[in-house]
Swiss-Prot record:
Phosphoserine phosphatase that mediates dephosphorylation of phosphoserine in the serine biosynthesis pathway. Also able to dephosphorylate phospho-threonine. GO terms for biological process: L-serine biosynthetic process. This is Phosphoserine phosphatase. It is an enzyme of class 3 (hydrolase). It comes from Pseudomonas syringae pv. tomato (strain ATCC BAA-871 / DC3000). The keyword Acetylation does not apply. Its EC number is 3.1.3.3. It catalyses: O-phospho-L-serine + H2O = L-serine + phosphate; O-phospho-D-serine + H2O = D-serine + phosphate. Binds 1 Mg(2+) ion per subunit. Keywords: Amino-acid biosynthesis, Hydrolase, Magnesium, Metal-binding, Serine biosynthesis. The active site is at D39, E41. Its cofactor is Mg(2+). One of its GO terms (molecular function) is magnesium ion binding.
Length: 237
């Protein structure tokens, strides 16, 4: 008969749980646990609002953070346009359900996950993301929420926090992770700057010109090489 263990016989939490875990270091004493932080739209999947603009024929919905760096200004413009045309959340979701990841994106994410922890840091919304994230194998996604009324009209949005991509990188670094980040637009640049290494991917010329401190590449093969170059581990393609 198995011996009974009483509460008094067990110290909880266990003593080991109170001992800080040692950092996992490489041969030269650098943190060897690395997180790859990626933007979503324009990097792994099409720009959702551009796809919706093409479907509806509403040219003004094509604007993204590549065009309007202030995300609050951009979203208020989008919500106003949706309201003017009587478009609901379901209308946007119907278009999203037809989209596929960019060519090579699924293979790239699989390649990355074999070598890094992978987190998607995006200014998209959970109400948009599921069809595309399913095709990417559901990597971790940190993003925002939309607020709708009882008629499915999008009335507002809830940001996770101010400058959320940079704040996420700061939080990961506080846990002693080393961060390599990739993005394509203005709203990614604070994340890239806070990361241990930042990479522009599929970025337009104006963003590349304004942020020459970041290497800029345009294919997934080039992006793999930049991640290998930025890592403090010996990695291969």
């Amino acid at each position: 008969m198995a011996a009974m263990v009483t509460k008094s016989a067990v110290q909880w939490p266990l003593p080991e749980a109170r001992v800080p875990l040692p950092l996992i270091l490489n041969a030269v004493g650098e943190c060897a646990v690395e997180i790859a932080c990626l933007d979503l739209e324009g990097v792994l999947v099409p720009e959702i609002w551009i796809a919706f603009a093409e479907k509806t024929g509403i040219e003004s919905l094509r604007a993204t953070t590549r065009d309007i760096p202030d995300y609050d200004v951009l979203m208020k413009q989008r919500l106003r346009i949706l309201d003017e045309h009587g478009l609901k959340l379901a209308d946007i979701q119907a278009v999203i359900s037809t989209l596929k990841p960019l060519e090579g994106a699924v293979e790239f994410v699989d390649w990355l996950r074999e070598r890094f922890q992978v987190v998607i840091l995006s200014d998209t919304f959970y109400e948009f993301s599921q069809p595309l994230m399913r095709q990417l194998g559901f990597p971790t996604l940190l993003c925002h929420r939309l607020i709708t009324d009882e008629t499915d009209r999008v009335v507002s949005y809830q940001l996770r926090q101010k400058d959320p991509k940079r704040q996420s990188v700061l939080a990961f670094k506080s846990l002693y992770y080393r961060i390599i980040a990739a993005g394509d637009s203005y709203n990614d640049t604070t994340m890239l700057g806070e990361a241990d290494a930042g990479i522009l991917f599929h970025a337009p010329d104006n963003v590349i010109r304004e942020f020459p401190q970041f290497p800029a590449v345009h294919t997934f093969d080039e992006l793999k090489k930049e991640f290998i170059k930025a890592s403090n581990r010996e990695l291969v393609l």
